[in-house]
Amino acid sequence: GKFSGFAKILKSIAKFFKGVGKVRKQFKEASDLDKNQ
């Protein structure tokens, strides 16, 4: 019912933030590499 829809939204938000975290980490590592070169 209502609650499962809410849980789905929470799950997709969590997934989104995980993806953003991964991208930010990769971006930071890439910029660190640029500094080192």
From Swiss-Prot:
Localization annotation: Secreted
One Pfam family from the record: Antimicrobial_3
Keywords, sorted A to Z: Antibiotic, Antimicrobial, Cytolysis, Hemolysis, Secreted, Toxin
GO cellular component terms, A-Z: extracellular region
InterPro entries named among the record's database cross-references: Antimicrobial_3
Tissue expression as described in the entry: Expressed by the venom gland.
Native organism taxonomy: Eukaryota, Metazoa, Ecdysozoa, Arthropoda, Chelicerata
Function summary: Disrupts biological membranes, particularly those rich in phosphocholine. Has antimicrobial activity against Gram-negative bacterium E.coli, Gram-positive bacteria B.subtilis and S.aureus, and hemolytic activity against sheep, pig and guinea pig red blood cells. Has insecticidal activity against S.frugiperda ovarian cells by opening non-selective ion channels. Enhances the insecticidal activity of spider venom neurotoxic peptides.
Protein name as annotated: M-oxotoxin-Ot2b
Subcellular location, principal: secreted
Biological process per Gene Ontology, one example term: defense response to bacterium
One GO MF term attached to the UniProt entry: toxin activity
UniProt keyword Transferase present: no
Similarity comment text for this entry: Belongs to the cationic peptide 02 (oxyopinin-2) family.
